[in-house]
């Protein structure tokens, strides 16, 4: 059941796949997509559906739809039917028919209303309205102008047409698919229209409620047809505008018009591409370029100047009689063109040639030429032409077949039937093809084996290597063509015939000596099956001695017989098939032999114009034979005339007298370039601009324009990333540091400069902008000088006269006359007051105002100021310029196009004077005010008392009149106890009066209120006394009155409280104003003080935090040698670690052991002193001879484990290392520190991306073993270090040395060199383990990034700045001592090994000298290496793109082992001394390869003496050699210049930006001085003002580049050439990304076994000069390869021929040869017993893998087209390219 279900499911899937891939479904899909290519034809269709109504409207809809579908059907049929496709595919045919029809249709509908039909059904046939609608839709569908520019939608059917077999079914299904899409589209349009008509909301918005607009709406509806016509016309004109109009296109003068000669045009070419049938340029598709004239008389001369003729001689009588047997066809007339009179010549050219000149520049073509004489051959667009050809012995369709060749072949077949090819069967063709190439392969194989045998016999290299075949044009002198022109070296397509030197007169002698005939093979392979051997290596043909091919074959190749063609038929056939370029017209023998041969003249497409650029026009305006109008746009440049000397005299005349042009002597001009990007550069005028449809430009000036598709290539986008650390740092910096004024001014000046440049470029970019601007400037200058300023002077003096002041006519007129308006160039170079710049209307102008006039209200008196005042004035105004530039708006600016300056105000001095006078008046009135102030208090006091008395009486009288109360001061009665009401009334009355009096305080002044308060107090006292008397009188009353007395006491107390509250309230109101003022002042002071203290507090916190952070890592050495920490502890104690509840499992192996020992070396080892005797004999120690106390001590510290018998100190396991490390209290790290050091993300990244598969402590010697051992699988477990005892001995010996040094140290402070040396040794060991030093030798590793290596690989003493010593002197001594010890210790058994060390550190030395701020990477270098390596992931970059500077330092005979206080080379001494003086200076850049030997350890003293002697001898010898070879330079600048000039062949000079402004200022002053008669005074004044700089004046006449570079004026740099990437480079870069070697991330089975190479075999072939001693640069890519015996051309041929099985007839398609299923073939070299190689098989495999790097991509690239005559591009698909192995030799 399951099998049945799977069977059904598989059938369904296969059925679905077949349906999807069927021709019908694909045709429906492509046809449906074609619907979206909407064009102008839809306008007619939509108009008929929208506006036509009624019965006639329905008929019009039907006719429009029918015409639309019929037009599209014709377009689909034209794909299959060739004549219809040619008729519709000719752009000129459609264009010529479309333009008149469009004009007719536009004017026909322009005078009629759409709804005014005026006809009935009976005259419809007469009006032809329905038929016109049908024709409109049909014709416009054929026009095929797309709304989408360059739309691919309509071309999809054409593209897929050639991929299917059943073409008719595909065309039919495509049309059906288009029809379905069209019906759906029209239905959707109809639904939208119905929805609009039915939707009331839309209709209500359209209703016009005003009668005023109804007429306009009706007119709009009536003119709808006209609107449609206008839209259609504009659309078609726009798409015709994509092709330059034949009428308005810029006419270019031909060669005959510019004075060209026939000799200028006769230059040969090999290819003649022609216009394509599918071209969009509007070029002629008739075979104009293929027109060939047959001249019966061979003596006729060719008079056309702009044609290049290829003449072919053949005996038409003999050929027709012998080959064809038909005398009537003897003329072989391909095209007959009758000669006419000269005045009828314009009738000869077709109409298309007159209207559409195909030679016109219709595309943005670049005009590339070699010399000024010749015209460029027209290079057409790449064309797709399908034709059958042979490929690999089979007939195949090629889509890049030359159309002219196919036309010529069809022409030959029609005229010469016997030349028709005989169709052979597939087996015959394949067999014939296989036999040819098999025989060719055998010859190459035999020759190659002979050469290898000669190599075994140790023959001379000159006889073994194959000679390169070169093209020789002078056999006697052995003169060859240059390599770039040699077709044997660079392929046939690149061959060029040597051109004449420019402006050389061709004489008869030159013709005889230098020009000869040549045979060019054209089309023989197409027409005849010529024997391959017969014509392959024919040296001489027809005994022509003027041309020969020098081909030196070595004695190994079999001599091939030179066959001469003897039979007449072969001669005639050969002459017919080979074109002869007759360049020697004096060769009479040649003419006699072929006198009866007529000529076939073939015109090569060549531009008939001689174009020059605009820059060439500016450079040579007055030269002869140069066209006046440039045809090529250059970079925007303007010729600015700086100086015009009408009377040449003196030195200027003597310097310029050699120039022939007298007018040029009078001018000094500069060329000014525009600073904006110019896309028109090198484009021919009248051509179209490139269609940048995918670029987005959002700024006015944008440097790097690219498509939005590549936004992901940008490093950081501001809206996708937010750098919080950078923002935080910026905020802290802004809080701590104040912004400097200089920086602000600099930024402001930069912004101003950018703004000025933008304004200048804007004026320069628009058309007629300079004319408008120049006119405005001149107008503003005239208005200012002669109208505005005189008018202001008149108004000012008139006002002064009205104000009875003296006028200042003379002073104002003097200042007005002093103002000068100097005309300047566009850059601001001043000329004179009357002289205008040349072409100032087009180039631009500036007007500079010297001593500008400012209107002043009055002039100061002319008394002489003191010297001090004058100096102060000049100092204040020293920076102020006494000139300005005029703007378009009449304003003044300091620089051209700068911001407007503020003029001195006319009224500002008046306001200042008024203020001064007011101040004087105040001073005079001060005395009067003082007297008044003294007498004022008396007067105020009298007035106050009078006022108070009046108010008092008034209030008293008013109170009496209002109420009839008992007077307080009059007679009164004592109330009885039964009358308590009156007392309450009295009290109430007093309270009421008090409240009334308090209210009165609001409107009385302070004096009145005080008086009133005083009166009230008196009254209160009186009332209080009266109350007391009354209370005393009532004390004698009965007990019944006690309650009343108690109540009265309460009332009295409440009265007192209320009165006190009132009194305090009054005082508080009076004093509240001052209280509020005081509070506000205190608050403002507190806020201000807080703001002031914020920077101080933040600064203090910042420094405290940084101090705390730094104190974690810095330790001080006290006098007693004990270690103490400053503030915070870097490593916590054991108690803190135990107290943590949550423990982590730490990987102690990730710690750098170098850092551990470095820290331990700083700890005083006092307890080890008593154990010296034990440790001196630690090799023989066992647990029986050691005391238990010492055992316990060692076990506690993890030094020895005596339980492990026969285990010495050197053979400790990883667990012992961990336990000992944990016993040290410094490494009981807290949780935070471990989290920072051992990051989980980092560990994951290392496990994921690490190239080294074993991250344990095992370190393999990468130089002792092959580099492929890194790919050997190793298990990861703890005791893995015991697997490689050799390496462990080497590693642990370093530790042993460290322990020995630390224990036997007699000094209190431990020598720090041990820790440094140990770290350096471990780093070098780490490099060896991960094979970083041998990265260049690993061929499978296609990348190398120098940034993965840290600073200490070149600087051995870089760790020393962190070592503290007691004094500076001791520090210096320790440094030199440490340097020696490092060199001594790091020589660890690397002798007798050739080192390859890339000098990647030289790429960027600045990074090496930077100080390290990240302490993690300093103490843990292994972290830094891998983390920085795999952040960049550079393995997709090919190695040759990165290793551009591949340097290798080889030190073979130099063995450097230095004693402790012994010999140091002088260059290193100098570097050490310089390093001690300034730490930031660079050290000596050379990499010293250290070597050591095992004998050094056994007998160090003897080895040291021998090594020292060898060092001194080698060093002295090397220094002598260096002095002989090295060129002596006086300074580094000369050496750098010489090095630069030898390295770069082209360079340019750029002056320093610091001197740029100074030089320009000097130029401006010079331009002014050369016009003056007496320039001395102006020169002195300009020097005083600082306008002229004397320090950059060139006193010497001849300056060398070195002197200029020393002065800092010129900076030399390579030329930024525009790189034109060739096809090979593009293919290499494209495929280099996909060619990621599989060994990057997985283990290859090929490298499981270790391999060794016996180097004895190679030492024989190494010459003597290769055994160098010092600094030998070597390229591993040039290593000897046996295949290089052959030449590169034959090498490729040999590789390709041996990869195919030619004997197999039923071979598969060529694409299958690159399938993945094919197994890798064996190697090329068979293992031969007589070869002196190692017997191990792996050595040979590794050798060949290492020596054969350059045979992969280029073989595939040239395989099809070059070797097997294959033009089918499908055979070379980059997707199937793979890295294949060598091919065998059968």
Swiss-Prot record:
The chain crosses the membrane at residues 19-39, 68-88, 91-111, 133-153, 176-196, 227-247. One of its GO terms (cellular component) is chloroplast inner membrane. The keyword Zinc does not apply. It comes from the Eukaryota. InterPro entries: TIC214. It is a multi-pass membrane protein. GO terms for biological process: protein import into chloroplast stroma. Keywords: Chloroplast, Coiled coil, Membrane, Plastid, Plastid inner membrane, Protein transport, Transmembrane, Transmembrane helix, Transport. Signal peptide: none annotated. Involved in protein precursor import into chloroplasts. May be part of an intermediate translocation complex acting as a protein-conducting channel at the inner envelope. There is a partial copy of the N-terminus (positions 1-343) of ycf1 in the inverted repeat (ycf1-A, BAA84433). Part of the Tic complex. Component of the 1-MD complex, composed of TIC20-I, TIC214, TIC100 and TIC56. Interacts with the translocating preproteins. Hydrolysis of ATP is essential for the formation of this complex. The 1-MD complex interacts with TIC21. This is Protein TIC 214. The lineage of its organism: Eukaryota, Viridiplantae, Streptophyta, Embryophyta, Tracheophyta. The gene is TIC214.
């Amino acid at each position: 059941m399951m099998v049945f279900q799977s069977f059904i499911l598989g059938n369904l899937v296969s059925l679905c796949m077949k349906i999807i891939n069927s021709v019908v479904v694909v045709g429906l899909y492509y046809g449906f997509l074609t619907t979206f290519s909407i064009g102008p034809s839809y306008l007619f269709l939509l108009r008929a559906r929208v506006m036509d109504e009624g019965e006639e409207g329905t008929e019009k809809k039907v006719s429009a739809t029918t015409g639309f579908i019929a037009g599209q059907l014709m377009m689909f049929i034209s794909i299959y039917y060739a004549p219809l496709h040619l008729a519709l595919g000719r752009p000129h045919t459609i264009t010529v028919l479309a333009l008149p029809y469009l004009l007719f249709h536009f004017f026909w509908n322009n005078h009629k209303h759409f709804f005014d039909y005026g006809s009935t059904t009976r005259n419809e046939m007469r009006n032809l309205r329905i038929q016109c609608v049908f024709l409109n839709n049909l014709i416009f569908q054929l026009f095929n102008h797309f709304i989408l520019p360059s739309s691919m939608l309509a071309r999809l059917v054409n593209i897929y047409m050639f991929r299917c077999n059943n073409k008719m079914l595909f065309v039919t299904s495509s049309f059906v698919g288009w029809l379905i899409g069209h019906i759906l589209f029209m239905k959707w349009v109809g639904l939208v229209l119905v929805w609009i008509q039915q939707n009331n909301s839309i209709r209500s918005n359209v209703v016009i409620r005003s009668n005023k607009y109804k007429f306009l709406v009706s007119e709009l509806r009536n003119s709808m047809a006209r609107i449609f016509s206008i839209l259609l016309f504009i659309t078609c004109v726009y798409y015709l505008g994509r092709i330059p109009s034949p009428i308005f296109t810029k006419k270019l003068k031909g060669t005959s018009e510019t004075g060209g000669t026939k000799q200028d045009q006769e230059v040969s070419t090999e290819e003649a591409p022609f216009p394509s049938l599918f071209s969009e340029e509007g070029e002629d598709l008739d075979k104009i370029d293929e027109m060939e004239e047959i001249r019966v008389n061979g003596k006729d001369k060719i008079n056309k100047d702009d044609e290049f003729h290829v003449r072919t001689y053949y005996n038409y009588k003999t050929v027709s009689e012998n080959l064809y047997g038909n005398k009537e066809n003897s003329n072989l007339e391909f095209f007959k063109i009758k000669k006419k009179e000269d005045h009828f010549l314009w009738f000869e050219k077709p109409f298309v040639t007159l209207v559409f000149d195909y030679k016109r520049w219709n595309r943005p073509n670049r005009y590339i030429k070699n010399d000024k004489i010749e015209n460029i051959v027209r290079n057409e667009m790449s064309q797709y032409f399908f034709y059958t050809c042979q490929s690999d012995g089979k007939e195949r369709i090629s889509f890049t077949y030359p159309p002219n060749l196919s036309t010529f072949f069809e022409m030959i077949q029609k005229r010469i039937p016997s030349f028709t090819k005989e169709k052979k069967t597939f087996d015959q063709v394949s067999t014939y093809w296989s036999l040819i190439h098999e025989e060719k392969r055998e010859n190459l194989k035999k020759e190659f084996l002979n050469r290898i045998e000669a190599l075994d016999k140790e023959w001379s290299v000159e006889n073994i290597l194959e000679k390169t075949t070169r093209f020789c044009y002078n056999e006697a002198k052995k003169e060859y063509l240059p390599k770039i022109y040699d077709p044997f070296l660079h392929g046939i397509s690149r061959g060029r015939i040597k051109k004449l030197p420019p402006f050389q007169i061709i004489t008869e002698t030159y013709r005889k000596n230098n020009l000869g005939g040549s045979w060019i093979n054209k089309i023989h392979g197409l027409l005849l099956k010529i024997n391959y051997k017969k014509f392959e290596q024919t040296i001489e043909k027809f005994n022509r001695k003027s041309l020969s091919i020098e081909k030196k074959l070595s004695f190994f190749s079999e001599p091939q017989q030179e066959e001469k063609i003897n039979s007449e038929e072969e001669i005639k056939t050969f002459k017919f098939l080979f074109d002869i370029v007759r360049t020697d017209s004096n060769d009479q023998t040649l003419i006699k032999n072929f006198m009866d041969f007529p000529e076939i003249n073939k015109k090569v497409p060549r531009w008939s114009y001689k174009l020059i650029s605009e820059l060439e026009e500016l450079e040579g305006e007055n030269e002869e034979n140069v066209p006046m109008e440039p045809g090529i746009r250059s970079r925007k440049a303007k010729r600015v005339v700086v100086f015009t000397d009408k009377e040449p005299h003196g030195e200027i005349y003597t310097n310029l007298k050699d120039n022939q042009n007298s007018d040029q002597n009078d001018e000094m001009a500069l060329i000014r370039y525009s600073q904006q990007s110019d896309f028109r550069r090198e484009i021919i005028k009248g051509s179209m601009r490139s269609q940048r449809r995918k670029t987005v430009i959002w700024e006015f000036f944008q440097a790097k324009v690219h498509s939005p598709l590549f936004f992901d290539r940008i490093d950081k986008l501001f809206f996708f990333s937010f750098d919080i650390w950078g923002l935080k740092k910026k905020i802290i910096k802004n809080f701590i540091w104040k912004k400097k004024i200089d920086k602000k001014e600099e930024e402001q000046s930069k912004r101003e400069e950018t703004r000025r440049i933008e304004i200048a470029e804007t004026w320069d970019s628009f058309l007629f902008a300079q004319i408008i601007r120049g006119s405005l400037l001149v107008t503003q200058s005239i208005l200012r000088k002669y109208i505005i300023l005189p008018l202001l002077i008149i108004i000012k003096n008139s006002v002064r006269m009205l104000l009875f002041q003296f006028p200042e006519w003379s002073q104002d007129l003097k200042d007005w006359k002093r103002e000068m308006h100097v005309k300047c160039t566009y850059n601001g170079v001043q000329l004179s007051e009357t002289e205008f710049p040349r072409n100032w209307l087009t180039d631009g102008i500036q007007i500079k105002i010297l001593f500008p006039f400012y209107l002043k209200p009055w002039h100061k008196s002319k008394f002489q100021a003191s010297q001090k005042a004058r100096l102060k004035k000049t100092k204040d105004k020293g920076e102020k310029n006494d000139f300005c530039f005029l703007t378009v708006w009449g304003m003044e600016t300091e620089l051209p196009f700068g911001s407007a300056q503020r003029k001195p105000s006319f009224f500002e001095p008046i306001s200042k004077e008024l203020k001064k006078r007011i101040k004087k008046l105040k001073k005079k009135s001060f005395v009067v005010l003082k007297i008044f102030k003294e007498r004022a208090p008396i007067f105020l006091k009298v007035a106050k008392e009078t006022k108070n008395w009046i108010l008092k009486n008034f209030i008293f009288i008013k109170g009496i009149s209002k109420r009839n109360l008992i007077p307080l001061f009059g007679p009164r009665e004592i109330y009885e106890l039964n009358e308590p009401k009156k007392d309450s009334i009295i009290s109430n009355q007093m309270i009421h009066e008090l409240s009334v009096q308090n209210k009165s305080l609001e409107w009385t002044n302070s004096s009145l209120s005080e008086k009133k308060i005083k009166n009230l107090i008196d009254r209160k006292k009186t009332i209080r006394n009266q109350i007391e008397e009354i209370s005393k009188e009532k004390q004698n009353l009965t007990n019944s009155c006690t309650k009343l007395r108690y109540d009265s006491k309460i009332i009295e107390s409440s009265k007192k409280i209320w009165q006190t509250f009132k009194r305090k309230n009054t005082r508080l109101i009076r004093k509240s104003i001052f209280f509020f003022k005081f509070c506000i002042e205190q608050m403002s002071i507190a806020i201000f003080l807080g703001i002031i203290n914020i920077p101080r507090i933040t600064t203090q916190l910042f420094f405290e935090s940084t101090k705390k952070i730094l104190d974690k890592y810095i330790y001080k050495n006290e006098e007693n040698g004990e270690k103490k920490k400053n503030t915070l502890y870097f490593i916590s104690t054991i108690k803190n670690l135990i107290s943590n509840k949550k423990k982590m499992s730490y990987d102690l192996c990730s710690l750098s052991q170098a850092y551990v020992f470095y820290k331990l070396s700083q700890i005083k080892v006092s307890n080890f002193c008593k154990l010296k005797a034990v440790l001196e004999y630690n090799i023989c120690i066992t647990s029986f001879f050691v005391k238990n106390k010492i055992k316990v001590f060692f076990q506690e510290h993890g030094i020895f484990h005596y339980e492990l018998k026969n285990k010495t100190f050197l053979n400790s396991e990883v667990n012992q290392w961990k336990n000992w490390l944990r016993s040290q209290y410094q490494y009981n790290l807290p949780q935070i520190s471990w989290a920072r050091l051992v990051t989980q993300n980092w560990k994951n990244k290392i496990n994921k991306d690490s190239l080294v598969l074993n991250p344990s402590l095992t370190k393999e010697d990468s130089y002792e073993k092959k580099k492929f051992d890194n790919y050997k699988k190793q298990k990861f477990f703890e005791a893995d270090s015991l697997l490689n005892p050799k390496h462990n001995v080497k590693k642990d010996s370093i530790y042993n040395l460290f322990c020995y040094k630390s224990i036997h140290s007699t000094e209190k402070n431990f020598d720090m060199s041990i820790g440094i040396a140990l770290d350096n040794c471990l780093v070098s060991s780490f490099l060896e383990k991960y094979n970083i030093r041998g990265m260049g030798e690993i061929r499978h590793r296609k990348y190398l990034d120098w940034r993965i290596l840290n600073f200490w690989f070149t600087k051995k003493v870089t760790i020393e700045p962190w070592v503290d010593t007691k004094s500076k002197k001791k520090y210096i001594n320790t440094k030199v001592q440490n340097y020696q010890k490092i060199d001594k210790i790091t020589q660890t058994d690397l002798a007798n090994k050739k080192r390859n060390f890339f000098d990647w550190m030289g790429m960027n030395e600045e990074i090496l000298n930077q100080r390290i701020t990240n302490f993690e990477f300093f103490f843990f270098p292994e972290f830094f290496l891998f983390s920085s390596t795999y952040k960049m992931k550079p393995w997709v970059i090919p190695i040759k793109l990165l290793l551009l500077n591949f340097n290798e330092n080889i030190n073979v005979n130099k063995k450097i082992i230095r004693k402790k206080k012994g010999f140091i080379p002088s260059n290193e001494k100098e570097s050490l001394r310089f390093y001690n003086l300034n730490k930031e200076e660079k050290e000596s850049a050379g990499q010293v390869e250290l070597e050591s030997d095992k004998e050094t350890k056994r007998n160090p003293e003897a080895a040291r003496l021998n090594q020292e002697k060898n060092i001194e001898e080698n060093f002295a010898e090397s220094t002598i050699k260096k002095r002989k070879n090295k060129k002596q330079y006086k300074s580094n600048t000369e050496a750098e210049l010489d090095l630069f000039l030898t390295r770069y062949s082209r360079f340019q000079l750029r002056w320093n930006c610091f001197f740029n402004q100074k030089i320009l200022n000097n130029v401006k002053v010079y331009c002014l001085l050369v016009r003056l008669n007496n320039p001395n005074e102006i020169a002195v004044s300009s020097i005083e003002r600082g306008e002229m700089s004397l320090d950059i004046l060139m006193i010497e006449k001849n300056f060398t580049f070195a002197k200029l570079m020393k002065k800092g004026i010129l900076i030399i740099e390579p030329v930024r050439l525009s790189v034109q990437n060739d096809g090979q480079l593009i293919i290499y870069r494209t495929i280099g990304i996909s060619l990621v070697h599989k060994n990057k991330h997985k283990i290859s089975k090929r490298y499981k076994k270790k391999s060794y190479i016996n180097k004895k075999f190679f030492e024989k072939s190494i010459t003597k000069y290769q055994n160098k001693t010092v600094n030998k640069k070597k390229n591993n890519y040039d290593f000897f390869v046996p295949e290089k015996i052959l030449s590169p051309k034959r090498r490729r041929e040999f590789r390709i021929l041996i990869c195919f099985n030619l004997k197999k007839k039923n071979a598969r398609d060529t694409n299958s040869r690159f399938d993945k299923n094919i197994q890798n073939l064996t190697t090329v070299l068979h293992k031969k017993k007589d070869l002196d190689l190692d017997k191990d098989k792996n050595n040979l495999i590794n050798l060949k893998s290492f020596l054969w790097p350059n045979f992969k991509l280029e073989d595939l690239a040239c395989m099809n087209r070059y070797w097997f005559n294959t033009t089918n591009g499908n055979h070379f698909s980059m997707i199937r390219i793979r890295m294949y192995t060598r091919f065998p030799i059968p």
